[in-house]
Amino acid sequence: MKKTIFVGDLHLSADRPDITQAFIYFLNHGLDNTEALYIIGDLFEVWMGDDIAESFTIAIAEAIKTVSNSIPVYFTHGNRDFMVDKQFCLRAGMKILPEVYCINLYGVNTVILHGDSLCTLDIAYQRFRRFRSLDIVRWVYSHLPKKTRLNIAAKIRQKSVQGNQQKHYEIMDVESSAVTALLASTGCQRMIHGHTHRPAIHQLTAQEQRVVVGDWYTQGSVLNVSEKGCELVTLPFSETN
């Protein structure tokens, strides 16, 4: 049966070669009968700029390119890799999607996004999110020296980890009113997102559904969508060696 696959929150980095290995294995062996692949944010733990190419990012681009030569591969920016630009996506053969993207998926109107915009109770993060989304901020960052960008990325990552440890569970999850509002404004019956690292299929009403993809910290997490519905599948790293 034909299917569309969604993954997100891989947080690939040079420090976790096991995740990179698992993802490349998935790209090479886990896409049978797949019509399209959606990577919905935080593919990388941090992205310093398309002009700073680490060896593992080159390997990832080449592996994705092999897939995109056969099927469409779509990419949504996350909160960690929001600086990924056209250069990398061109190398990987990925099409960059807008922050909120709607598609009719096997007869169900579906809205796709990373999900951080739905965590409206996290006021401090939403303030930072608006700031880093400004064109002038992105322009200034992209023109900083490479060493400076590396230092900024390291500090942002450290501050994010420390901040999340102090936040309540509810603050770091999506806000139900934000979910309801987005479904209403887009006219969709299904929402697919990541960001929270809490994989689940939530049946909101008889007609509406919210599906959350999982992270790849301890195992792979894949969402298969077909005409039969949605299925969350785990990929143990032990099977990718």
Swiss-Prot record:
One of its GO terms (molecular function) is UDP-2,3-diacylglucosamine hydrolase activity. Mn(2+) 1 binds at residues 9, 11, 42, 197. Keywords: Cell inner membrane, Cell membrane, Hydrolase, Lipid A biosynthesis, Lipid biosynthesis, Lipid metabolism, Manganese, Membrane, Metal-binding. Mn(2+) 2 binds at residues 42, 79, 114, 195. InterPro entries: Calcineurin-like_PHP_ApaH, LpxH-like, Metallo-depent_PP-like, UDP-diacylglucosamine_Hdrlase. GO terms for cellular component: cytoplasm; extrinsic component of plasma membrane. It is found in: Cell inner membrane. Its EC number is 3.6.1.54. Substrate binds at residues 79-80, 122, 160, 164, 167, 195. It catalyses: UDP-2-N,3-O-bis[(3R)-3-hydroxytetradecanoyl]-alpha-D-glucosamine + H2O = 2-N,3-O-bis[(3R)-3-hydroxytetradecanoyl]-alpha-D-glucosaminyl 1-phosphate + UMP + 2 H(+). It holds the Pfam family Metallophos. It comes from the Bacteria. Pathway: Glycolipid biosynthesis; lipid IV(A) biosynthesis; lipid IV(A) from (3R)-3-hydroxytetradecanoyl-[acyl-carrier-protein] and UDP-N-acetyl-alpha-D-glucosamine: step 4/6. It is a peripheral membrane protein. Binds 2 Mn(2+) ions per subunit in a binuclear metal center. Its cofactor is Mn(2+). GO terms for biological process: lipid A biosynthetic process. Hydrolyzes the pyrophosphate bond of UDP-2,3-diacylglucosamine to yield 2,3-diacylglucosamine 1-phosphate (lipid X) and UMP by catalyzing the attack of water at the alpha-P atom. Involved in the biosynthesis of lipid A, a phosphorylated glycolipid that anchors the lipopolysaccharide to the outer membrane of the cell. NCBIfam families: lipid_A_lpxH (TIGR01854), PRK05340.1 (NF003743). Belongs to the LpxH family. PANTHER family: UDP-2,3-DIACYLGLUCOSAMINE HYDROLASE (PTHR34990:SF1), UDP-2,3-DIACYLGLUCOSAMINE HYDROLASE-RELATED (PTHR34990). This is UDP-2,3-diacylglucosamine hydrolase. It comes from Shewanella frigidimarina (strain NCIMB 400). The gene is lpxH.
